[in-house]
């Protein structure tokens, strides 16, 4: 396979981590919800872009302040469930849209910023109001085998 074809087959993943205080806030939420399979707080992140097309991502050094507004339960690609903390953060949505405008792709009709709290758990959705800080954006090649590797 030529290098150009290989690069065309690779995508781009952009994520952002939570600061320590925000991680601890979400750990308290996990405990309150009595989740059976809580995700390790060191794995907490928000996906900014999951693009099946490789793009050059302009680096930003910023902190986003987001409000967790709802805890929800989503069906995953492998048919299981994930408990997610859905958040409102207009600046993060703008960052996502900027990356789409320079050639990134997105598999879903809408971008919903969220942090996964647990896999293979089911809860009743509920509204909450918790502020979190998103720091340390990172970029890596898109892992199209992510579901298979995290089973």
Curated annotation (Swiss-Prot):
Keywords: Host-virus interaction, Hydrolase, Inhibition of host innate immune response by virus, Viral immunoevasion. SUPFAM superfamilies: LigT-like. InterPro entries: Acb1-like_C, Cyclic_Pdiesterase. 3',3'-cGAMP binds at residues 13, 108, 140, 146. Gene3D superfamilies: Cyclic phosphodiesterase. 3',3'-cUAMP binds at residues 13, 108, 140, 146. Signal peptide: none annotated. GO terms for molecular function: hydrolase activity. The keyword Hydrolase applies. Counteracts the host CBASS antiviral defense system. Phosphodiesterase that enables metal-independent hydrolysis of the host cyclic di- and trinucleotide CBASS signals such as 3'3'-cGAMP, 3'3'cUA, and 3'3'3'-cAAA. Does not cleave cGG or cA4. Besides evasion of the CBASS system, might also enable evasion of the type III CRISPR systems that use cA3 signals. This is Anti-CBASS protein Acb1. It comes from Vibrio phage KVP40 (isolate Vibrio parahaemolyticus/Japan/Matsuzaki/1991). The lineage of its organism: Viruses, Duplodnaviria, Heunggongvirae, Uroviricota, Caudoviricetes.
